Curated annotation (Swiss-Prot):
Tagged with keyword Transcription regulation: no
Protein's name in the database: UPF0057 membrane protein ZK632.10
Organism whose genome encodes this protein: Caenorhabditis elegans
Entry's transmembrane regions: 4-24, 32-52
Keyword Zinc part of the UniProt annotation: no
An annotated GO cellular component: membrane
Topology in the lipid bilayer: Multi-pass membrane protein
Amino acid sequence: MCQILLAILAIFLPPIAVLLDVGCNCDLLINILLTCLGIIPGIIHAWYIILCKEKTVVQNIYVQTNDHGTAPPAYSPYSA
C-alpha cells in the first residue's frame, strides 16, 4: 500500500496502519501498547515502521530431489 496513505492513516489509527504495512507481528503489538500509553507515541512508532524500517523479503525455496540411484547396503549384524 502507498506509504503516504499509511502515514496519513497512522495519524488517526496507528495500529491499523502498522497492521496493513507489516501484518500481525511484534511491531503491531508494540504499537498497540504505545497507543494505549498515548496517541503520540503510537503515531511516532507507526511512522517509524511505515517510513524508516526496512521491509524483510520472504523468499520460499523449494528443493526437489530425484534419488533414483542404487540403495545403500543393508545393515547386517553378521559379517558375510
